[in-house]
């Protein structure tokens, strides 16, 4: 992927792309882009590694949170109510940073950790059986979808992101997933379990990896894209990446099980 990116980038942008690539490999690209300027700056939009900023946030969280969770578990602190407190404190910090240091707030772990922490709260609540019963009410699914749609409609070039606007998306996702985990039989959950949406869910990680480099490449070659063409290219590229690379370990494991079963029957 990196070699392909360096092929498509203009000479004057090559240095910026190389620096972003290095920081992405170090799981630090979010802070790199925070130093370089805003997400919506023209120079940033031409960088094929721009999308790696959120991977940096995730990787930093996934490295630090398990360490904290192990320590908390040993002291009996790994409980949903404590994680809920962490999310609320993180949201308050995020609101402060959004208004005082908007560029850093957009990219930084300290202003984004509460979003991932909300998912951790949900996982612990489900595992410990402390999920609120009202989450399984069918009206919760409709409310969650409204919140998710509002978070998209109200987004304007990063205004009030990550807080308080991102709280709509986070709360909507928690309500939707929590409702399904709580046994809700909402029709909305059935729709989202349909084959086309499950397909998008299956390739979602590959979709995130390929969408931005593909868009940068086609823009540099053919100019601006319509949303439909951009989406089609991204989904097609993501499916290829998923089929050739991401699903390979699962296919190998399945093949190994078949070989083992045949030997067991022999």
Kindly give the residue locations of the regions a language model identified.
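Membrane-interface helix/loop caps of multi-pass membrane proteins
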Residues: 1-258
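Internal/C-terminal transmembrane anchor helices
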Residues: 258-266
């Amino acid at each position: 992927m990196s070699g392909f990116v360096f092929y498509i980038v203009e000479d004057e942008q090559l240095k910026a792309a190389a620096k972003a690539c290095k920081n992405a490999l170090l799981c630090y690209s979010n802070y790199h882009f925070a130093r370089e300027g805003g997400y919506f700056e023209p120079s940033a939009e031409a960088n094929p590694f721009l999308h790696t900023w959120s991977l940096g946030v995730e990787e930093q969280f996934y490295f630090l949170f398990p360490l904290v969770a192990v320590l908390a578990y040993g002291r009996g602190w790994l409980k949903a109510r404590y994680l809920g407190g962490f999310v609320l404190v993180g949201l308050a910090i995020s609101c402060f940073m959004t208004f005082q240091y908007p560029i850093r707030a957009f990219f930084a772990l300290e202003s984004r950790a509460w979003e991932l922490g909300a998912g951790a709260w949900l996982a612990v609540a489900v595992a410990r059986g402390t999920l609120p019963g009202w989450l399984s009410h069918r009206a919760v699914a409709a409310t969650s979808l409204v919140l998710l749609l509002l978070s998209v409609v109200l987004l304007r070039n990063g205004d009030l992101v990550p807080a308080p606007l991102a709280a709509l998306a986070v709360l909507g996702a928690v309500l939707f997933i929590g409702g399904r985990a709580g046994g809700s039989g909402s029709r909305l959950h059935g729709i989202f379990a349909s084959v086309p949406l499950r397909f998008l869910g299956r390739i979602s990680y590959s979709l995130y990896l390929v969408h931005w480099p593909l868009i940068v490449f086609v823009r540099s070659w053919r100019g601006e894209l319509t949303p439909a063409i951009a989406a089609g290219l991204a989904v097609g590229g993501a499916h290829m990446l998923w089929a050739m690379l991401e699903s390979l370990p699962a296919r190998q494991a399945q093949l190994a099980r078949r070989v083992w079963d045949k030997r067991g029957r022999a």
